[in-house]
């Protein structure tokens, strides 16, 4: 099948095509899903190299599960978000058990904030604040407010109720607001309220 | 909830917008590794299964000539068993012993009876 014809196809259809031996479907899925998986893994981990490892592992699991995939079962992205979150949580638990002291302190952005774009500084500040949240709060906030998913889909990914999702995102946002409130002036946060 | 969603979002939305605009992107090397993984998994799952070595019984079955020959053999074997366990009454009933006894050396029998060695 021509590669261009795959642009309109759903992730689920492409996965079935891949399982049937279509190499172009794998390329299309790689281009479409890997950036999303990588972005999500980075937001949950705050570490580029670890996020790459998690992304490769999550995609490998997707290739392996392809022959057993049932189109009516779930969305590929829902499945991937769940796999990524589980891999990230496992990684963070292992890292916590190994050496807390070895984790570098977040860089003080005050000295460099004037030199870099304000928007990038905000993204970086948010990532630092996200890193301080408990795993489940971080996951819920990222899925809701950065990935832009609806609460029922987040509930499916996290295997909890929508009420629990709302509670996690509310607590997460309160913690983020508290963490970022001290950096309002530096990041131009007060100007846009 | 103490604060409404609107209140919560009043300041955070600019950070979320910034995070969306500055998403971490996969390197070219990572994309290549993932592509290679896909090809490796596809090659594994689409490889034809290795022919299994036939068992001894199936080799013997083929050696004998398949099902027609084995069916004939089984029938002959069962008939043999049946003949072996059933008494041959029909063959003996009312028959004269001399009809099926053949004396291959009558002179010898006479000599024995007469005691003339």
Each model region followed by its residue ranges:
Chain A
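A short, charge-rich alpha-helical start-of-domain segment used by transcription regulators
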Residues: 16-39, 128
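Short helix-capping/turn signature of helix-turn-helix
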Residues: 32-35, 44, 142-149
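Helix-turn-helix DNA-binding module
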Residues: 128-139, 147-164
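Sigma70-family region 2
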Residues: 19-20, 46, 57-74, 94-96
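C-terminal edge and immediately downstream basic/flexible tail or linker adjoining helix-turn-helix-like DNA-binding
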Residues: 1-5, 17, 156-162, 173-193
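Arg/Lys-rich amphipathic alpha helix in sigma70-family domain 2
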Residues: 64-71, 82-101, 119
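Internal acidic/polar
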Residues: 7-11, 97-123, 150, 190
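Structural recognition of an alpha-helix C-terminal capping motif at a helix-to-coil junction
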Residues: 39, 53-60, 74-86
């Amino acid at each position: 099948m021509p590669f261009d014809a795959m642009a309109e196809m759903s992730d689920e259809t492409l996965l079935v095509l891949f399982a049937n031996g279509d190499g172009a479907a794998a390329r299309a899925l790689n281009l479409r899903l890997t950036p999303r998986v990588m972005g999500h893994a980075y937001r949950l981990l705050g570490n580029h190299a670890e996020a790459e490892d998690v992304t490769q592992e999550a995609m490998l699991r997707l290739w392996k599960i392809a022959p057993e995939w049932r189109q009516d079962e779930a969305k590929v992205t829902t499945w991937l978000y769940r796999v990524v979150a589980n891999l990230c949580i496992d990684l963070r638990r292992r890292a916590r058990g190994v050496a807390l002291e070895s984790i570098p302190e977040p860089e003080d952005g005050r000295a460099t904030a004037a030199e870099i774009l304000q928007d990038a500084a905000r993204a970086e500040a948010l990532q630092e604040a996200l890193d301080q949240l408990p795993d489940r709060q971080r996951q819920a906030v990222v899925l809701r407010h950065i990935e832009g998913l609806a609460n029922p889909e987040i509930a499916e990914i996290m295997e909890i109720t929508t009420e629990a999702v709302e509670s996690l995102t509310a607590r997460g946002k309160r913690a983020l607001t508290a963490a970022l409130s001290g950096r309002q002036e530096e990041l131009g946060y007060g100007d846009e309220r | 909830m103490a604060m409404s969603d609107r209140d919560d979002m009043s300041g955070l939305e600019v950070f979320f917008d910034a995070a969306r605009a500055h998403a971490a992107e996969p390197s070219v090397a990572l994309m290549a590794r993932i592509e290679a993984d896909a090809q490796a998994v596809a090659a594994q799952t689409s490889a034809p299964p290795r022919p299994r070595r036939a068992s001894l019984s199936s080799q013997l079955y083929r050696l004998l000539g398949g099902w027609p020959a084995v069916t004939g053999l089984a029938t002959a074997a069962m008939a043999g068993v049946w003949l072996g366990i059933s008494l041959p009454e029909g063959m003996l009933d009312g028959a004269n012993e001399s009809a099926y006894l053949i004396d291959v050396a009558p002179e010898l029998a006479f000599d024995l009876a007469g005691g003339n060695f």
